[in-house]
Every structure is written in structure tokens, then in C-alpha cells.
Amino acid sequence: MEIRWLGNFTFEVRSSVGVVIVDYEGKLPNPTKVKDANTVFVYSSDDDEDHVSNDFQVLTGPGEYEIGGLSIRGVATPADDPAISRKINTVYIVDADGLQVAMLGNPGSQPSAQSVQQISKVDVLIINTESQGL
């Protein structure tokens, strides 16, 4: 597995079965520019219309996904103070090549005990150091 920082909040997790691009900024790239046909884009929040695509698998919320051999879990956590907002941040856990990689996204406050339990044990944790909730 290879993990690369692509700038700002964007990371690439490349495994033997596919690629996960986390929080890609701007419009999705032209499919001919993407090297791996099994590329999945995941977003910790769904507040941008540029995330819609007919060419790529795009995940924008919690759930369990199996895409081309990639196992991806999205766990809901608060994007803001839960007392004032119901917006969610999705923590994604990619399970590939025998490793679990978790991307915290942009949490707005501490996750619940249930969310922490769903995230569980991970091998690599990617944290946005500019997140307001850290």
C-alpha cells in the first residue's frame, strides 16, 4: 500500500486492488487522466456539487461499501457542535492489502463512543491538522 499527500486536505491511498482519493478539491478529473480504472473518490462532507460523477464511484456519506475489491467503511461523526448543528463528517476506513487506513476528515467535535467503536483499531490514521474540532 502507498499513501500520498496530494496537497491541502487531499490524500491518495493506493493498494493492489484500487485507489481511494480522499477529499479531492475542485471538479473531478477527466477519466482519461486517471491511471487506475478502480479509483474511488470519498468526501468527508457532502457540501459541494463538484462531487457528482457518472465516470467514478463517489462516496459522500456513512455506510459500508465494497467496490472492485476495496472495502470502505464510512462512520458518521459531528461536523459541528452537535448542540447547534446536525451536519455530519464522515470518517472513512479503507481495508486493503491487510491494512486499515482511517481518514478523520474534518470533525467538528469529539466523536461519540459508538462512532469510536465503529472506527475500531486502525493501522494508519490520517488527520487534518487544521480541523476545528481537534
Please report, for each region that a protein language model flagged, where it lies by residue.
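Core dinuclear metal-dependent hydrolase active-site scaffold
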Residues: 1-39, 47-124, 131-133
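Histidine-centered catalytic micro-motifs
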Residues: 44
